[in-house]
Regions:
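Transmembrane-helix boundary motif in ABC transporter permease subunits
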Residues: 62-92
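Generic hydrophobic transmembrane alpha-helix motif, especially the helices
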Residues: 93-129, 136-137
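Hydrophobic alpha-helical transmembrane segments of polytopic membrane proteins
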Residues: 199-235
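Transmembrane alpha-helices
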Residues: 120, 124, 156-189, 222, ...
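Conserved small/polar residues in nucleotide/adenosyl-binding loops
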Residues: 238-247
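Short cytoplasmic-facing helical segments at TM-TM junctions of multi-pass membrane proteins
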Residues: 133-175, 199
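N-terminal signal-anchor transmembrane alpha helix
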Residues: 6-23
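Periplasmic/extracellular loop-to-transmembrane helix junction in inner-membrane transport proteins
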Residues: 24-65
């Protein structure tokens, strides 16, 4: 309860500071919070904000699923096969430092300006986070569990799907949901070209027309969605770990 109260104070303080800044600055640069809220209500009433969220959500979802579908098997391969680890580990280690936005013009040249380009960009943005995260999750697995499995007659493959995958599931799920939130932060880039719907499209169109209040509104919606994903990630991970602990106690 105290934590919730402190967060409410922080939220109100941010809104108050924003309000003071808007009163002492040109609204072209710092819009009034009331105008931003009114814009949000208009888009809620006409349903445009839900259409934008739907299109953005689907783009991020497709990219995130592809990222996970590649990152998890590759992570298991790198963790369990020495040759793959020697070859791929140096590449994976530098992934987190890649300038993701630098790929945008290249992807336009390679795939054009349709949905393939947008999803490819979001795939890169999410994959460079997911791939190292999967390896970190696997490295947290207790090696004694794997050794015990091998001792009682499990094959290497059995230790993967009976020990490693269940042990890393909460952490990987947490990484996946966080990756989803990260994908939303890149929408303002990938939806600026040839997009008719989406939160990034709202930002691009509003910016071109000098409607800073709409830009702020779309950014706030993206931030709120990311916060929701972070909360879902925390709750899901907590429940999975609690279930795993109970299962271990039963065993």
């Amino acid at each position: 309860m105290k934590t919730f109260f402190k967060r409410c104070i922080l939220f109100v303080s941010i809104i108050f500071i924003w309000y003071l800044c808007s009163k002492n600055a040109n609204h072209l640069f710092v819009p009034d919070p009331k105008d931003v809220f009114n814009d949000l209500m208009i888009l809620v009433k006409n349903g445009q904000i839900f259409i934008a969220i739907k299109y953005s959500f689907l783009r991020v979802l497709i990219a995130a699923i592809i990222s996970a579908a590649i990152a998890i098997p590759v992570g298991l391969l790198v963790y369990n096969v020495g040759l793959a680890r020697d070859i791929l580990n140096p590449i994976i280690n530098v992934m987190r430092y890649l300038p993701v936005t630098a790929f945008y013009p290249l992807l336009i040249m390679w795939f054009g300006i349709d949905e393939t380009m947008k999803i490819s960009f979001l795939f890169i943005a999410t994959f460079v986070y997911m791939m190292p995260s999967v390896l970190l999750c696997l490295e947290e697995v207790n090696q004694d569990l794997i050794d015990t499995g091998l001792t009682i007659g499990m094959s290497k493959l059995q230790t993967i799907y009976k020990i490693q995958v269940p042990a890393t599931l909460p952490s990987i799920l947490n990484s996946f949901i966080m990756m989803f939130g990260i994908g939303f932060t890149y929408l303002s880039v990938c939806e600026t070209v040839n997009a008719k719907y989406g939160l990034g499209y709202i930002i691009q169109q509003s910016s071109a027309r000098g409607k800073t209040d709409m830009v702020f509104m779309a950014i706030i919606v993206i931030v709120l969605i990311s916060i929701v994903f972070d909360y879902v990630s925390t709750v899901s991970c907590t429940h999975l770990r609690a279930h795993e602990t109970k299962a271990n106690l039963v065993c």
